[in-house]
A protein has these predicted regions:
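Divalent metal-dependent catalytic cores for phosphoryl transfer on phosphate-bearing substrates
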Residues: 1-150
Length: 150
């Protein structure tokens, strides 16, 4: 699909982390995206690739949005210098990611040696942190249990 640069940036800012849902749901990652791991995914201190969700996000964008610019911006949102066509707009998506991740101090995907521990970290909506007054927040959520197919 054809989008203006502005529209592409908006879509990428909104969809850059959609892959977290796909990854946690056990969706299959196509080999063409798995092969991009070394290009777009940073490594943690143990030498393991992190932020694999961006590959799932790009796969989602390719299938549903069908726009190369949006796909490339989503892919580069953790390493914006990897998108050499326009690093400036890639850094906008990086900023959007940092703002939206403010609900958690440190991602389990970043710090843990376990490949599955990030699945236990709840994804919280950033707007849950907004307080309308000086009173203690009455934020409530419920844990979602894995589905039992038996």
């Amino acid at each position: 699909m054809k989008y203006t640069e502005r529209e592409a940036v908006i879509l990428a800012a909104l969809l850059h982390d959609i892959g977290k849902l796909m990854q946690r749901a056990g969706e299959n990652l196509k080999p063409e995206y798995k092969n991009l791991e070394g290009t777009y995914c940073p490594k943690n201190k143990y030498g393991r690739y992190t932020h694999i969700h961006l590959l799932y996000s790009a796969q989602f964008v390719k299938y549903f949005i069908r726009n190369d610019l949006v796909e490339n911006l989503v892919l580069a949102h953790h390493l914006p210098d990897r998108y050499t066509k326009n690093t400036r707009i890639a850094k906008i998506i990086t900023l959007a990611d940092r703002l939206s991740s403010s609900e958690r101090e440190e991602s389990c995907e970043d710090s843990s040696t376990s490949k599955l521990s990030y699945k236990k970290t709840p994804l919280l909506w950033p707007f849950t942190m907004i307080k309308q007054s000086k009173e203690v927040s009455s934020f409530k959520c419920c844990k979602i249990q894995p589905m039992d197919y038996n």
